[in-house]
């Protein structure tokens, strides 16, 4: 299942993850991780989506820069991480955000909000990465993996829009538009993937 979402299968299968399972990619690669505290974007009963998008863009650039200055446990991991420009951006404190919004952690609304925030962050990250690649050139494995990467991006877009997927053996769970408590976030998620 995870390999159906693999952006670089021409360079090998995904065979495992890091210990926390947030990073799944090629053997002997690593990525620098960063997490944004979601609660910092919530004030006066409203989630500041504009600030969240801005922070996502800044962290994407920061993580790209960090590839050049990171220390890795071996030369091979350092080289492959440089070659593939791996980065990992996530968020923390979804529970705190949901509690402050009065939403249950396991509620349909809570899951839909989480899905929308994840879709926004991931779509904006991909779009920002593409902007950097346009100016600086893509990572070295892009050309041989281009069609796979673009299919994965189209499938993320399909999940945001709730449309058909390509080449998945297990259908993805689409963004739950109906239960998201902030419809502006649904629209932002869709537009983020339209831009990616």
Residue locations for each model-derived region?
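Internal maturation/activation junctions in enzymes
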Residues: 55-78, 82, 86, 104-196
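Function-dense linear segments that define catalytic or interfacial modules
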Residues: 1-101
């Amino acid at each position: 299942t995870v390999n159906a979402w693999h952006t670089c299968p021409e360079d090998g299968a995904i065979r495992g993850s890091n210990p926390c399972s947030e990073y799944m990619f090629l053997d002997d690669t690593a990525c620098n991780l960063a997490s944004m505290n979601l609660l910092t974007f919530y004030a006066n009963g409203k989630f500041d989506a504009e600030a969240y998008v801005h922070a996502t863009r800044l962290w994407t650039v920061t993580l790209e820069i960090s590839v050049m200055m990171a220390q890795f446990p071996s030369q091979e991991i350092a080289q492959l991480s440089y070659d593939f420009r791996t980065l990992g951006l996530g968020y923390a404190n979804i529970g705190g955000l949901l509690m402050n919004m009065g939403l249950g952690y396991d509620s349909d609304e809570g899951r839909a909000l989480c899905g929308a925030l994840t879709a926004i962050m991931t779509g904006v990250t991909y779009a920002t990465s593409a902007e950097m690649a346009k100016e600086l050139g893509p990572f070295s494995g892009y050309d041989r993996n281009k069609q796979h990467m673009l299919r994965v991006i189209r499938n993320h877009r399909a999940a945001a829009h709730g449309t058909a997927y390509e080449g998945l053996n297990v259908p993805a769970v689409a963004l739950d538009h109906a239960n998201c408590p902030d419809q502006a976030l649904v629209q932002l998620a869709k537009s983020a993937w339209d831009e990616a």
